[in-house]
């Protein structure tokens, strides 16, 4: 129903990116628009909501393009390329504020105002997004419905039959659910990393839990450096992943490496040595961005409603984080209220994710239609 002369996925990519660019230009200026504090906070929250929605609107179609146009044998490689490029973008995002500061652009600002180095980073990110989307839009030629049906060896009308999300889930291939289980453990683990890394590093390296202290702020600054190294590890590992012939082994090994990284964090008391575990964590992150979609899109061959299924699969990213956030306080109390122990919880979750990979079967494409 969404096929038009501009393609099936490209319009979503273009519109979602356009909204994201607009928000990226407005968001860092929230404190400079003369609004009251409460109004500025609401503006920021609404802007983040639009940014998150628009980025999802843009990212899902380019993942679907791989599922639409890349054969089964090369999908893992294609998703690894996407993982490499995504993490390269993250790397650039971490570098730009430091680079602008080194060039003499102010890294400090009055209370309630974002520093120029951060504002310019947002602008550069918006420009890069525009250029990348324009390149994709102008160079990728999507198939028309007939070509798509011929390539995927199914009838053109297979995607036209209406089906509710409950019906789709009931008819989903088993791989959809098995990869979803792996996703649950992985995204819960990373939710705890994002939530508790700052407090962990402040406690184990700077020996403080006072969020108002200078030491805590220094720890927060160093977390940004560690996330840079995580992104760098992801970029490098995304190049290695396609060279591992067995996809399940590649996925499981990556998650186990990440689990080792999480487990190391509480026991390292030197900020420079913390680079190693975060590089290892980056290996798991690279696999999480590439492997799940390769398994699921291969399993969905012949099912139809691929876009709807990938949209539903996005729930395996959101729901684990919601559950992890809801349970985080209880778990923290259970592990002695020490934030660094949550990194061990994250390690255990990632290890469970690695073990769950063994449940995934390599499905052969099928010619199926949705049963109402």
Predicted regions and their residues:
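Intracellular loop-helix junctions on the cytosolic face of multi-pass helical membrane proteins
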Residues: 31, 35-47, 57-58, 62-63, ...
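Intracellular juxtamembrane helix-capping segments at the cytosolic ends
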Residues: 57-70, 287-302
């Amino acid at each position: 129903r969404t096929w038009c002369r501009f393609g099936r996925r490209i319009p979503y990519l273009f519109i979602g990116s356009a909204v994201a660019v607009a928000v990226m230009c407005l968001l860092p200026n929230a404190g400079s628009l003369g609004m009251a504090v409460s109004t500025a906070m609401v503006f920021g929250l609404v802007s983040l909501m639009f940014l998150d929605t628009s980025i999802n609107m843009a990212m899902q179609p380019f993942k679907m393009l791989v599922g639409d146009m890349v054969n089964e044998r090369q999908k893992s490689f294609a998703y690894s390329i996407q993982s490499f490029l995504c993490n390269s973008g993250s790397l650039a995002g971490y570098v730009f504020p430091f680079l602008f500061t080194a060039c003499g652009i102010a890294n400090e600002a009055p209370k309630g105002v974002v520093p120029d180095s951060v504002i310019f980073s947002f602008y550069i990110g918006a420009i890069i997004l525009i250029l990348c989307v324009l390149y994709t839009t102008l160079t990728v030629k999507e198939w028309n419905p007939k070509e798509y049906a011929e390539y995927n060896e199914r009838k053109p009308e297979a995607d036209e039959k209406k089906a509710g999300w409950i019906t789709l889930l009931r008819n989903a291939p088993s791989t959809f659910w098995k990869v979803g289980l792996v996703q649950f453990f992985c995204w819960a683990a990373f939710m705890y990393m994002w939530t508790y890394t700052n407090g962990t590093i402040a406690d184990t390296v700077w020996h403080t839990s006072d969020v108002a202290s200078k030491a805590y702020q220094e720890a927060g600054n160093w977390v940004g450096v560690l996330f840079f190294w995580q992104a760098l590890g992801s970029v490098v590992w995304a190049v290695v992943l396609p060279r591992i012939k067995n996809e399940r082994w590649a996925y499981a090994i990556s998650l186990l490496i990440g689990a080792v990284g999480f487990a190391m964090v509480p026991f390292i008391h030197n900020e420079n040595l913390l680079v190693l575990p975060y590089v290892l964590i980056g290996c798991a992150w690279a696999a999480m961005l590439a492997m799940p979609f390769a398994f699921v899109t291969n399993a969905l061959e012949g099912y139809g409603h691929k876009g709807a299924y990938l949209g539903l699969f996005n729930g395996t990213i959101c729901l684990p984080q919601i559950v992890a956030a809801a349970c985080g306080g209880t778990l923290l109390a259970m592990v002695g209220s020490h934030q660094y122990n949550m990194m061990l919880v994250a390690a255990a979750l990632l290890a469970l994710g690695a073990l769950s990979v063994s449940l995934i079967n390599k499905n052969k494409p099928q010619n199926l239609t949705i049963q109402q």
